[in-house]
Amino acid sequence: MARGPRYKVPFRRRREGLTNYRKRRKLLLSKKPRLVVRKTNKHIIAQVVVAKPQGDVTIVGIDTRALAKFGWKGDENNTPAAYLLGLIVGYKARIRGVKEAVLDIGLHRPVAGSRVFAVLKGALDAGLEIPHGEEIIPSDDRISGKHIAEYAEKLKKENPELYKTRFSRYLQRGLAPEELPTHFEEVKKKIIEYYEGKLAKAIAQ
C-alpha cells in the first residue's frame, strides 16, 4: 500500500469503481439536468437527475423492463431496447418540463455506437436537447436490430439447432429474431403515439 505525506486515499466510491468524481464535477458545473445511463447484465437503466444541495433528485427513472408495456418481445439489454428506453425517458422528461440535459455515462467507456449512446439517440428523438457528436450515435441499422436479424437468418440456415438455442428467449416470446427490425418499428410507433398524446396534454395545461 502506498504511504507518505503526499499519498491521498481515494474516495470510497472511486476506490470501488462506482464514481468518477472529476467527471461528475464537470457535469455538475453545467447546472443542467443529467441523463444518467447505466447497464446491468440483464437491463439498461435511464434516469433524468437534477443536482440539489441536499443531493441528487430523480425527475424520471425507468429501465428496459418497462418496454413490455408496449409489447416489446426482444431482449432488454440490446441496442434496440436501449434506444426505445431513451425514447421513453426523453418523453417522460419533457412531460415533466425538462427541455435539455447532459449525458452522464458514469464509468462506462465512451465507445462510439454503444448502447449508452443508443439511449442518447432515443432521448434526442424524443425532443430532449443534449450536447453530443454525431459520430458516437449508433447507425439506424444497429438501432433497429438489423445486425441481429441478419445474424439470426444466417444461423437459421447454417445451424438450426444452435439458432433455436441462441434465440430461445425470442422464440418463447413469439418473436422470430429475423423479424426484429419490423417489431422494433412497431413498438417505436406505439411509444411515440402514446407519449405524444401525453405531451400534448401536458403542454395544454
From Swiss-Prot:
Keywords of the record: Ribonucleoprotein, Ribosomal protein, RNA-binding, rRNA-binding
KW RNA-binding (keyword) present: yes
GO MF term list: 5S rRNA binding; structural constituent of ribosome
InterPro entries per the UniProt record, alphabetical: Rbsml_uL18_euk (IPR005485)
GO cellular component assignments: cytosolic large ribosomal subunit
Single Gene Ontology BP annotation: ribosomal large subunit assembly
One Pfam family here: Ribosomal_L5e
Function in brief: This is one of the proteins that bind and probably mediate the attachment of the 5S RNA into the large ribosomal subunit, where it forms part of the central protuberance.
Family of this protein: Belongs to the universal ribosomal protein uL18 family.
PANTHER family from the UniProt entry: LARGE RIBOSOMAL SUBUNIT PROTEIN UL18, RIBOSOMAL PROTEIN L5-RELATED
Subunit structure: Part of the 50S ribosomal subunit. Contacts the 5S and 23S rRNAs.
Protein name: Large ribosomal subunit protein uL18
